[in-house]
Amino acid sequence: AMNLMERKAEWRGNLIILLQPAEEVGSGARNIIKAGIFEKFPRPDFNLALHVSADLVAGKVGYVPGWAMANVDSLDITVKGRGGHGAYPHTTKDPIVMASQLINSIQTIVSREIAPIEAAVVTVGSIHGGTKHNVIPNEVRLQLTLRSYTDEVRNQTISIIRRMARGLAEANGLPKDLYPE
């Protein structure tokens, strides 16, 4: 901003510096627009969006025309089962095994269900389940991040994950009240 103001004679127009909150969870821009940003300030003729990148060395600036980064969705899945003692796994519906099956299935979405000319990323970033060596828990929680450039691919990916989770629950003989959320 200071650099632009020092060179004000070299450009003309309105300068709006906007720091977007909650950009990683996808709600920041939506909330700014709902709050009336374009009623309070003039619409800019040009937009310049900045974001840090693990690909760039500190102090370097990268640029691309058009799309620079994909949209992001966070998805939480609770894989439910019926816990029990580790010595009697045959009396349980093990959510750790089911969660690992789901994770392996999810890894095929981009390579086998999304068109090769589209871009998508599905990452399982967190798995939480169980607290003891010899106890099968009642549930496992997964945290995923999804990235895509279009709403069509976004919706398709979410739909596939839901289908896989329901199919896995059915294949493991779970009653419908224990299907993943």
For each predicted feature, which ranges?
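DPxDG-like acidic metal-binding loop motif
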Residues: 1
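Histidine/acidic-residue-rich, glycine-tolerant segments that coordinate divalent metal ions
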Residues: 4-137
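Short, hydrophobic beta-strand segments
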Residues: 77-81, 140-148, 178-181
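A non-catalytic, amphipathic alpha-helix used as a structural packing/dimerization or gating element
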Residues: 98-101, 156-164
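A common structural junction motif
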Residues: 110, 162-172
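Generic structural motif
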Residues: 122-124, 176-180
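A conserved active-site cap/scaffold subdomain adjacent to cofactor or substrate pockets
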Residues: 133-159
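C-terminal catalytic subdomain
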Residues: 157, 172, 178
